[in-house]
Amino acid sequence: MKNLPIIEISKGYKINYIEKGKGRNLVFIHGWLGSSWVFETQIEYFSKNYRAIAIDHLGHGKSDKPESESYNLEDLAKFLDEVISKIIGNEKIILLGHSMGGMIAQIYATTPILAKRLDGLVLMSTTPKYHNPIVDQTKDAILSGQINLLDENIVKTVIINLMFNGKYQKAKPDFINEFVRKTLEMDEIVALRTFKSVLNCDILDKIKDITVPALILTSDKDTMIFPEDSELMKEKIPNSKLIKLSPKIGHYIQYEARDDYHKAVEDFIITI
């Protein structure tokens, strides 16, 4: 995989990304606590027929992590567009966002000056307005600093159990350990501020204005963002298709249902 020179955007921040292949531009954007690393398999797979790009949001992965930023999702969408412009100019893209990345993708698609770049949208395990009873019980303690999101025990138990189905955890212990290690490398301030931004995001009333074709992907056992949220998006987004991956598939569909995920995305791309 080609690790390209880091892009510098207007504020002087350096943004990391990975890229491989030629053809239509597929841009993958990761979720909360993630990085481009979570799409390495997809970059390899889709680069056979497409130009596949995965970007580290500001504050994530190998990108700069300035403490001066609020890390609200609207800003991350604008930074994302600036990075895309530096990489591919004015070319069109298909934007594929997972979890928080899917929320950013919806903001992108409902912001006219940004949306004009889109050929299509893939919304993966995401929501226009976040709610989760498990998170609701602890969010005040997290936001006040009583609970450290990046405490190793919290990551290994609560976060991993929200991200992955138990069956997958048992089948892939080495991968789960690597996922924990990568998560613990996350900047604590960024983790907290993006957590707050996810909680504050509400674009439910805007997604009816998405005009490009949209593929909505969810799974039957996602306990981080519930399948019902995807069903709601399907109702609201005019030109959209919903696929629920099963059986016993958790939040990270690109891992737990890799082959079905690849097929669903490929089948969608050839129709737009």
Predicted segments, located by residue:
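Alpha/beta-hydrolase fold catalytic core
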Residues: 1-26, 48-51, 88-89, 116, ...
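Active-site loop/oxyanion-hole signature of alpha/beta-hydrolase fold enzymes
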Residues: 10, 53-100, 107, 259-263
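Conserved HGGG/HGGXW glycine-rich cap/lid loop of the alpha/beta-hydrolase fold
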Residues: 13-65
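Flexible "cap/lid" loop of the alpha/beta hydrolase fold
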Residues: 106-111, 117-150
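Conserved alpha/beta-hydrolase catalytic His-Asp/Glu region
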Residues: 132-134, 152-208
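Short beta-strand/loop motif that positions the catalytic acidic residue
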Residues: 210, 216-218, 222
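Conserved alpha/beta-hydrolase "acid-adjacent" motif
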Residues: 223-229
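Catalytic histidine-centered segment of alpha/beta-hydrolase-like enzymes
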Residues: 249-262
